[in-house]
């Protein structure tokens, strides 16, 4: 079981059934989903499918996914995770999504800092982010966090300091 990761303003914790409404608010928002690899959700059924997929991928070791919870209101404001692990487990991709209502307030920077620190405990030494070329906000965030453009993707070596 993966641990909860606690920061100053956010907690990363396992996604659960109680999060369905907050997740639909995130994944059903066209602005939030503009550059996401998944289509914008149109029904709560799609959230249930997402949650089932998260459980299945975690059970097979293919992915680790957390809900990003704002501590102040105990609301799920996003998700982040690690996936596409290399054979040796030393590299993987990082993915994240934040409710547009919480953009540009430092929540994702804090969440990713917690995630990257945890990744080092798993033996991960290289993270990759696959970011759409038009997603200037995400590019700026990942560059701020030390990622460098590399073959149309962004990479960062760990540890994260």
Q: How would you describe each model-predicted region?
A:
Residues 1, 53-55:
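Short, P/G- and charge-enriched loop/turn segments at secondary-structure junctions
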Residues 1-34, 65-161:
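Acyl-donor (CoA/ACP) binding surface of acyl/acetyltransferases
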Residues 31-53, 64:
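Conserved GNAT-fold acetyl-CoA-binding loop/helix
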Residues 56-61:
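Short loop/turn motifs at secondary-structure junctions and domain boundaries
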């Amino acid at each position: 079981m993966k641990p909860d990761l606690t920061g100053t303003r956010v907690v990363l914790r396992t996604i659960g059934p109680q999060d369905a409404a907050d997740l639909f608010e995130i994944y059903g928002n066209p602005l939030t989903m503009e550059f996401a690899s998944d289509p914008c959700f149109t029904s709560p059924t799609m959230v249930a499918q997402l949650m089932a997929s998260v459980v299945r991928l975690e059970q097979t070791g293919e992915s680790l996914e957390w809900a990003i919870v704002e501590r102040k209101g105990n609301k799920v404001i996003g998700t982040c995770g690690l996936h596409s692990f290399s054979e040796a487990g030393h590299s993987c991709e990082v993915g994240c999504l934040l409710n547009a209502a919480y953009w540009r307030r430092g929540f994702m920077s804090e969440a990713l800092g917690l995630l990257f620190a945890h990744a080092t405990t798993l033996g991960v030494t290289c993270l990759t982010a696959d970011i759409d070329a038009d997603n200037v906000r995400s590019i700026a965030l990942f560059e701020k966090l030390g990622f460098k453009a590399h073959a149309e993707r962004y990479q960062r070596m760990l540890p994260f300091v």
